[in-house]
Amino acid sequence: LTEVHSQDPSLSSTERRKIAARSVEAINHAIRGIPAEKVRFHTCYGINEGPRVHAAPLPEIVDLILQVNAGAYAFEAANPRHEHEYHVWERVKLPAGKILIPGVITHYSNIVEHPELIAERILRYAKIVGRDNVIAGSDCGFSSQATYNPEVHPKVVWAKFQAMAEGARLASKQLWR
């Protein structure tokens, strides 16, 4: 859904949404017969460390994302281009029974996020959509496409995941006390 925006930024918002809506139809057709709770949909902006000035803002596409027949929605939320977009969930109601998987670690940087920052990111979402409706995730994968061309060194990736586990423990202590 986001690729339409970044691949041809000259398209109008209406044109981009029309193309993205066809993609949603195709996705739903492809997963027909699979219970929604068994489907996790990832909204991908791409893997590279580019400037992301043409990345689709979440408020412009959130309604389309929620039309995908999935039980959970994963999206970039830790990188500097999208971290502020958690506010969209203050205006958009998460449908009952659905789960958000916001990225709380990013593939855009070799910096290992601090567990306390990760906990804060988890808590932001939990406060808005409820603690039972959030699973911590990564913004995206850590290598380009299926060719294993790492942009973040594997040792750094493991350190990021360790920090995410610790951040989730910290958030859980606050959410379930």
Residues of each region from the PLM?
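Domain-level signal for soluble alpha/beta catalytic cores
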Residues: L1-R177
